[in-house]
Amino acid sequence: MQFTKRLRDPIARGEITCSVRIWRQPHVKVGHSYRMGEGRVVVDALRQIKLEDVTPALARKSGFAGVVDLLKTAKHGHGDKVYLVEFHYEG
């Protein structure tokens, strides 16, 4: 999983533990780990959600000011399925 630079430190501190992604199909697997900086992000849960499930509270929990801000970053390619990825950081 890749994250914008401004999210990496809060993720490493455990302040951000989820991410909303818009993909055609999942790009990560539960239980797998993905390199981020000196450590790894480990995926704890992955589930498809509806676009209307992306609330201002979820956007803030994901490290964004609001839903519009999050959606500008969440879309990757031509996907139209919304996924909530929950994870933890291992340094």
Question: Model-derived features: where do they sit?
Answer:
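Mixed-charge, low-complexity intrinsically disordered regions
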Residues: 1-91
